[in-house]
Amino acid sequence: MNPIDTDDLEKHTPMMRQYLTMKAEHHDMLLFYRMGDFYELFYDDAKRASELLGISLTARGKSGGDPIPMAGIPYHAVEGYLAKLVQIGQSVAICEQIGDPATSKGPVERKVVRIVTPGTLTDEALLQERQDNLLAAVYQGKVGFGYATLDVSSGRFVIAELETKESLEAELQRTNPVEILYSEDFGAMELLHHFKGKRRRPEWEFDYDTSIKLLLAQFGTKDLHGFGITDARLSLQAAGCLMQYVKDTQRTALPHINAITRFNQTDTIVLDAATRRNLELTQNLSGGRDNTLAAVLDNTATAMGSRMLQRWIHQPLRDHAQIFARQTAVNELLETTAHESLHEQLKALGDIERIMARLALRTARPRDFARLRQALNLLPKLQQSLAQLSAPHTVKLGQLLGEFPEEQQLLERAIVDNPPMLIRDGGVIREGYNAELDEWRGLSEGATDYLVQLEAREKERTGIATLKVGYNRVHGYYIEVSRLQSQQVPLNYQRRQTLKNMERYITPELKEYEEKVLSSQGKALALEKQLWDELFDLILPKLHELQAFARAAAELDVLSNFAERAETLGYTCPELSSEIGVKIEAGRHPVVERVSQTPFIANPVTLYNQRRMLIVTGPNMGGKSTYMRQVALITLMAHIGCFVPADRAIIGPIDRIFTRIGASDDLASGRSTFMVEMTETANILHNATAQSLVLMDEIGRGTSTYDGLSLAWSAAEYLAQQVGAMTLFATHYFELTQLPELMAGVYNVHLDAIEHEDTIAFMHAVQEGAASKSYGLQVAALAGVPARVIKAAKHKLHQLESRDHQVEGVNVNGTRAPIQTLLALPEPVENPAVSKLKAINPDNLTPKQALDLLYELKRLS
């Protein structure tokens, strides 16, 4: 049966009619339907939940004549199951009982109070604390794309206007949203195939006028001029759809979403999707975080600092003034050792950024208030530490931290030291905060003394020494005696419950007291909930200032972390230059040096106007790719304000970093390894400029040697002579080492190896000049190729060398053949039939002439 078919509701029980009506309103997600202590799922939802969560699939009688598939989840364990579902891209509607079962006629009143989707999470238990949790929307116009992202757990709202598919792909790679909304007419689905949380939305949700109205209402402004985004039409349409989706799922006000910013690629170094992937910035090639740049650089004290660091890594700055401000702050923290005390103080702050989002959404829990109180208690000490520092950027951040004495005192008076998890449990509001609450609690808490006194009195009155007075939630207060002694109870004892060996009674006095106590408990809980709600109203007027406090603290954390990393890992402050070039002395790969079991060999690189391209040669496993990547990573680190793993680094203006390193088949798009490689190469050749840093590794593999060599030669020539980009060009085509003889600005460098009998030792040191050979057979032996195969290969090699034979134009001994021989290929001769066909003017031919020409073309072919 289809649970969203509401045409035949009368066939079903009242409870199932209620369920089916709600399911019809939330047909595109799982519906968790609260029944007592369980959330139940029915029909297809039950089958899907059973499959996804590994829970039992049962049946709940019949409704409408058919068995009802059913699966259930205990309410107290729901967060764990929700976490599993959102991790695989599922959305869930939470339907709660809001009516009183005791007074309800028919099904208890229920309501969907919460919709959980991967991109709208704010619950601490469901979020990954050190990763942004982004909801995105994309809209395709006639020319270009609009892209918007929102982190509901922090309120960060960003849009971008993107001209090409490639730039959209790069943004998707950079932001890595957990849920993405797209229009019905979106025409680039191949870019979204690997995202789990995809949501197709109707075209009208992207309407421009509706989007503007939504955003103006959200920000409480008359126009959007103050945000500098009025010309970003496509991305505003995406932002409008995104805003409506969040309103629909959160079902509450969203005061923490109070601004929107525009991401301009011109402000940052452009990193395309391939570059972000190849450099393993925040995610390794296997999809994890181990052995990434972020893993090495991240020793932040707070989760919000960790998230900011990852955003910085993906957005290296181009403005030298902003970079210098960060460097100055880091340098002062390092020289004064202030980073040590700051790290400890910041560690105690907690994740204020996400706590403020939960406060804004009124989903905060008691322990969120306790953590906020702790952070505000620490603020004066943090301010005192910053007062000793003079770097302008640090001073500015200190001012943004703000002061909140009233809020701190309020939370100190209102919240107990160690509050319970949930407000419904009570015991959150501190004694003395509210006199009426204290009075109701006093009645309830005095019950213990009363019951002790009652038990002693009744034992004496009845003479039953084993008599006990107790309480449970089902039957309330009771007087318990053994069955053997039940004949001795007074006449005013009324039987309440019979057990195997016991009888439980209640007296009019105890009944009256029970009603009084339970009434006081209920009133205490109700009043405590009211006071709890009022706390939100008292704190939220300072929401914007508290959000600024969180952002400033996160940035201080990142800068302090940079100082610690520089001290611990031996990094130096890079110098920024206005002249184009990259000069690194004794540079090291930041990740490889941390995981290597042997000392890392530091290497230099020098690129400037008269030395723009380095042809990098050397054996496989010699370290060419590591060398190239370290140049890119050091350059990137310099542009986020971080110190770098080098003795000295001088970095000039950089607009883009490109990498063409490694490749594999793109099965989803039906592209071979060679096609992927050529696509990435084409992107570089089209978009690189004289201020770009380009890494090209092994261009031309996957095709014939003539084709590969020709492509590699032409690409290198184009980059050197037409583009003028700063380029590291690694190759096994030794013929390319003759390029320096033919083109200005091109130089050879190589990574050497030492051969001893049948073994090879890689030196990993970069030296000027070209490599002498490739050591292919030795590397094959190290890789475990059978000795028999290696022996046969050596025999074949000697045969070929003795004949001075070339295989497809490349000397098999690895030495360079004359470039004229290799590239001076004969011009292709046109087929005579094609020449004849090109010369024909069909408009001037008679039928007889046309027939004769057909015979002539047949003969020529």
Curated annotation (Swiss-Prot):
GO terms for biological process: mismatch repair. GO terms for cellular component: cytosol. The keyword Ubl conjugation does not apply. One of its GO terms (molecular function) is ATP binding. ATP binds at residues 618-625. Keywords: ATP-binding, DNA damage, DNA repair, DNA-binding, Nucleotide-binding. HAMAP family: MutS. This protein is involved in the repair of mismatches in DNA. It is possible that it carries out the mismatch recognition step. This protein has a weak ATPase activity. Belongs to the DNA mismatch repair MutS family. This is DNA mismatch repair protein MutS. It comes from Shewanella sp. (strain MR-4).
